[in-house]
């Protein structure tokens, strides 16, 4: 997807009244309400000088995780176009986070990242990177530095299993 397509995905479609009627029945669910509020909070991080946060909604198939994420992204435009998935490189997600600065970052389907130790380590690095608000510092061919991506966002992600092995440990 090109950046032009992403920009065009931030658009109004339908009416506020129709959107409210669509989400109203789901607002009774605490998790849905929290994810929706998280989406609304993304542009407030800068104003309130608040840190980035990462919301991870996981559970069994058909639990409404993706539907909640799409509803949260529908606040801003076309959810299908604004949502990405974990079948991405760290650099790709870094550049998307920079592009989405001050807006929510929706990432669906954690299981697409895979289950190998390499995949798990990469996934944990991605979570830390997004939460840190800055991409990797890279040199360029001329001896200088490339532009380093920076962002403020609320990342909202979904999956059918824990995002990290440490989150699945019983206490």
How would you describe each model-predicted region?
Residues 1-171:
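Phosphate-handling catalytic cores of nucleic-acid transaction enzymes
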